[in-house]
């Protein structure tokens, strides 16, 4: 069982702040987690291969293709209004001021 003092020390190391009533709950939960880890450590896994994927299927790989990723012209073709021409020239979206 993790004591209240140990829980406070762990919280301090993790830079967490708890109210006094929450430290007790944290201590209990942390003790439960440590008990679960102890149970898992008792399991004999020496004859079990490490799991690298939850699925037995192999991922299909594809060849890399170099393509143009400059989509600014396509995006800016849809700009309308007074700022459309300027937006296309400077390649920026012109928006109304948001922050005063």
Swiss-Prot record:
Matching Pfam families: GatC
GO biological process: glutaminyl-tRNAGln biosynthesis via transamidation; regulation of translational fidelity; translation
Disulfide pattern: none
Top-level taxon of origin: Bacteria
InterPro entries membership: Asp/Glu-ADT_sf_sub_c, GatC
Gene3D superfamilies to which the protein is assigned, alphabetical: Glu-tRNAGln amidotransferase C subunit, N-terminal domain
Catalysis: reaction(s): L-glutamyl-tRNA(Gln) + L-glutamine + ATP + H2O = L-glutaminyl-tRNA(Gln) + L-glutamate + ADP + phosphate + H(+); L-aspartyl-tRNA(Asn) + L-glutamine + ATP + H2O = L-asparaginyl-tRNA(Asn) + L-glutamate + ADP + phosphate + 2 H(+)
The EC number(s) this enzyme carries: 6.3.5.-
Annotated GO MF terms: asparaginyl-tRNA synthase (glutamine-hydrolyzing) activity; ATP binding; glutaminyl-tRNA synthase (glutamine-hydrolyzing) activity
Keywords: ATP-binding, Ligase, Nucleotide-binding, Protein biosynthesis
Subunit structure as annotated in this protein's UniProt entry: Heterotrimer of A, B and C subunits.
Matching NCBIfam families: gatC
Family: Belongs to the GatC family.
Function: Allows the formation of correctly charged Asn-tRNA(Asn) or Gln-tRNA(Gln) through the transamidation of misacylated Asp-tRNA(Asn) or Glu-tRNA(Gln) in organisms which lack either or both of asparaginyl-tRNA or glutaminyl-tRNA synthetases. The reaction takes place in the presence of glutamine and ATP through an activated phospho-Asp-tRNA(Asn) or phospho-Glu-tRNA(Gln).
Protein name: Aspartyl/glutamyl-tRNA(Asn/Gln) amidotransferase subunit C
Species per Swiss-Prot/TrEMBL record: Rickettsia canadensis (strain McKiel)
